[in-house]
Amino acid sequence: MLKSKTIDRVAAAGITLAAAFCLLAMVFSDAIAEAFGGAGVSMEYETELFDTSKIIEIDISMDEDDWAEMLENATSEEYYECDVTINGTTFYRVGIRPKGNTSLTSIANDPDTDRYSFKLEFDQYVDGQTCWGLDKLVLNNNYADATNMKEALTYDMFQFLGADASLYNYAEISVNGEYWGVYLALEAVEDSFMLRNYGVSDGELYKPEGMDGGGGGGFSMNGGGADLNYTVDDLDSYSTIWEGEVTNTTDADHERVVAALQKAGEGEELETYLDVDNLLRYMAVHSFVVNEDSLSGNMPHNYYLYEYDGQLNIIPWDYNLTLGGMGMEAFGGRGGGPGGMSFDGSGSDAGSSAVLQNAVWYSGCFLLLVIALLIAGVYRRRPKIRRRRNRQKALPPGT
């Protein structure tokens, strides 16, 4: 009995120390990043575009016939040439195209609106052109979100916890001088995103989808999609990941991903094969907002997978259906409750589940981050918790 109590006390003390360590790491993250090296790079577009104290003003100028043709053939998602003036600065020969999955097809089938979401690709026609360092800007129409706030609030939470996530701001859009509405502008997850967050742009990036269903590893048996569970060593079994490559990848790159998925699924050397620090922050927000249109939903998609030197990281994407949005009958939702938001090992991401099964990471870090979100909601204005932006392995529990 005495031995049992002693063990319990030691375990409790260990969790308390781990919680204190996590809190100190959040407070002194800049110093940690400097000590470990590999900090992210400050980009000019952070202040030029994503200063949320002021709305972005964007005017798109393009041939009227090209604009009409693009809208008429929106589902082809082909780029057209335009000039874009952002806050008074004009960028010439920019690529523009409609974007989306359900939102794209729904708008295309609606005779009453052409209010698509768009992508602006600044180097589509001019090599090396950027928007203050940004290679691509996403303009979301906040489809199926009557508040026009769900995605913005979610990205604000990610920023507050210091997770690797896109910067955001609202933007007033006009086309050839005609007002087109308010959109949510997002930093695309591409080279400039990697440079800002990791200090390099040579990691491997994927956006798994698999929305057409199929078989083999990488597919969810619950209704299609692209999960992150290890099945076999055969690379072809993970086609939903490779087909979503954003960077140019090779079989050697794919082998590193599969090896990491295997180790993560087995719960082995998690801090070596997963960016545990960022995953805890990602899961805290992700669970808080209940996003079933995601990796943890019935059809896993809407996320980016980043791999560098054999270590995996998850980057969030597409949060307009958070906070019960998937409960809408039109999307076949299950009520928007937390029952479908599980990282318990039975879902589509065994690695994240393994992280939360570690008592120190769960009680000492994950719950602390969720509590921080709750406190921030009560007091509204709050300092942001920074994360050490580097490519070093996450510090092991109890360090």
Kindly give the residue locations of the regions a language model identified.
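Disordered, low-complexity segments in secreted/periplasmic proteins that are enriched in proline
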Residues: 211-227, 326-357, 365-368, 375, ...
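Short, well-structured beta-strand/strand-turn elements
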Residues: 161-172, 294-295
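Internal "kinase-insert"/substrate-recognition segments embedded within catalytic cores
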Residues: 121, 126-127, 163-164, 178-284, ...
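N-terminal module-boundary/linker segments of secreted carbohydrate-active enzymes
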Residues: 29-83
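N-terminal Sec-pathway targeting helices
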Residues: 1-18, 357-361, 378-386
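Alpha-helical transmembrane segments
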Residues: 24, 369-382
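Active-site acidic catalytic loop and adjacent metal/ATP-binding pocket
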Residues: 60, 120, 271-325
